[in-house]
Curated annotation (Swiss-Prot):
Part of a crude toxin extract that includes BoNTA2/NTNH, P47, OrfX2 and OrfX3; OrfX1 was not detected. This is Protein OrfX3. Pfam families: Clostridium_P47. Belongs to the TULIP P47 family.
Length: 490
């Protein structure tokens, strides 16, 4: 299943039922509430545990607030009296906000921010609290000693609206009492340049909610991050893709295509070629069908990478990679390369290679989890020749006779290209290693994915002693990691 980070560097997605489980562990809900001198009277009652429910989207989060033993003295323009109910569920819509962690960390290398309910708003079109009217689950409703034993009437709903106004007024004054931290993110001020996976550390953060099938075990709350010192902009939407979590995992972590190519693949490719200077490659964002963009890691225009010398008919030649690109194609990546050798006969032999890979989870010799590459099918090789100088076939044939010790008969329509194909056959041995270089530079040389989790996932805590157990890695547009988040009771 394909997914997207929606232009964020990384996305950490957790199902809502796990978030609610963490809320229960902390018991942040105030037990009692009382409003005095309200605009529409007075009220009091008790709360049970608040929980996230279905109905939100993007930055909007809906909460269910169970209320017990509610009593009110209503003073309204069209209604006055005393009433209440034994129990009811109030639904509200709120937004969250990242705020500086309290108490402030004494570690100068940390900048902790907490995701909490936004308690204030100066924008009338974007209030801190929106009441979602409902009369479901109302039990023991009464007003002016008139107890309703049957279904609530329209008049009863009118009275309930006054009750809602009173509760909303208390919430607007006291919402900060629900002092729950949904998660804490460490926006690291200091990052060691020698540290592997350092680029995964968050430097800017936001959140988003995505509802899936009105199912809290599928709906997700996500932490959206820019990393390695980058900040957010209008290109980053406050949304999370509903497919951010792999089907086989409980929680998910995404690394964008741009970061995957620039920070995972780009540093590894030059190391495979001893004669590479390390600056020959770049990541470009090229347009694709439907107005979308795709990231490609490619050899820069005008650059080449020399390979080991070969001996062809007594001549020492240096084959070189003329073109190379790595493309992300949905759930796999494709490596395409063009390798060339220019022979002193006025002709060149060229080999085009294409191979494809999937990502998988593996372990290195140290027992650390790491990202590995698995080849799909067999590489394809296309070999051909080009005449680069105006050299007669008789001269080439003479060289072949002198160096190879056999007579090459002229084949009409092929000429010197047939001759150079024999010489260029030596090239195949050199470039045959190219389809395997990703696999060779694989498990034991790639940095441990544990370090990625340490610098990314572990910098985002949903409770004070989270454990994220990784069990899945694949390409799904971005690089998708899946695992199980264990939120422990502390």
């Amino acid at each position: 299943m394909q997914t997207t980070t929606l232009n964020w560097d990384t996305v950490y997605a957790v199902p809502i039922d796990i978030v609610n489980e963490a809320i229960k562990f902390k018991h942040p809900t105030p037990e009692q509430f009382e409003l005095l001198d309200g605009k529409y009277g007075d009220c009091k009652g008790s709360f049970q545990e608040w929980q996230i429910i279905s109905g939100g989207d993007g930055g909007n989060i809906r909460l269910k607030i169970p209320i017990k033993n509610f009593k009110a003295n209503v003073i309204g323009k069209y209604l006055s009296g005393t009433g209440g109910f034994e129990s009811a569920n109030l639904e509200i819509q709120v937004k969250l906000k990242y705020l500086p962690h309290f108490p402030k960390s004494k570690n100068k290398n940390e900048e902790l921010v907490d995701l909490k309910i936004r308690t204030k708003s100066n924008n009338a079109e974007d209030p801190a609290i929106i009441i979602i009217p409902t009369s479901e689950d109302v039990k023991g409703f009464y007003f002016n000693e008139d107890v309703r034993s049957l279904l609530m009437t329209e008049d009863d709903q009118f009275i309930m609206n006054y009750f809602h106004r009173l509760i909303k007024e208390w919430l607007e004054r006291n919402l900060y009492f629900f002092n729950y931290v949904f998660n804490t993110v460490n926006l690291n001020l200091y990052i060691s340049n020698n540290e592997k996976w350092k680029w995964t550390k968050p430097s800017y953060v936001d959140y988003a909610y995505s509802e899936i099938d009105e199912d809290l075990s599928k709906s997700i709350l996500g932490v959206l991050c820019m990393t390695d010192g980058r900040k957010g902009s209008k290109n980053q939407q406050q949304k999370i893709d509903p497919n951010a979590i792999p089907k086989t995992s409980q929680s998910g972590f995404l690394i964008s295509e741009d970061r995957l190519l620039k920070n995972i693949l780009l540093p590894t490719i030059p190391k495979k070629f001893p004669k590479s200077k390390g600056d020959e490659f770049e990541v470009v964002n090229q347009s694709a069908q439907g107005g979308t963009y795709s990231y490609i890691l490619k050899l820069k225009e005008g650059k080449k990478i020399n390979l080991d010398n070969i001996n062809a008919c007594g001549y020492t030649c240096t084959p070189y990679i003329q073109e190379m690109k790595v493309s992300l194609l949905g759930n796999y990546l494709r490596l395409e390369s063009t390798t060339r050798v220019d022979l002193p006969l006025g002709v060149s032999s060229i080999c085009e290679t294409m191979c494809e890979y999937r990502f998988k989870l593996d372990k290195n010799d140290k027992g650390e989890q790491t990202i590995a590459y698995e080849q799909i099918g067999s590489p394809t090789n296309k070999q051909y020749t080009e005449k680069t100088q105006d050299v007669s076939f008789e001269i080439i044939k003479g060289l072949l006779i002198a160096t190879l010790g056999f007579v090459l008969e002229l084949v009409p329509g092929i000429g010197s290209f047939l001759a150079v194909a024999l010489i260029g056959g030596t090239l195949v041995g050199s470039i045959s290693l190219i389809p395997n270089f990703i696999e060779n530079y694989n498990v034991n040389t790639a940095p441990s994915i544990d370090l990625s989790l340490e610098n990314s996932v572990s910098e985002i805590t949903w409770n004070s002693s989270d454990i994220f157990n990784l069990n899945y890695v694949a390409l799904a547009g971005p690089l998708q990691l899946g695992g199980t988040l264990q939120v422990q009771n502390t």
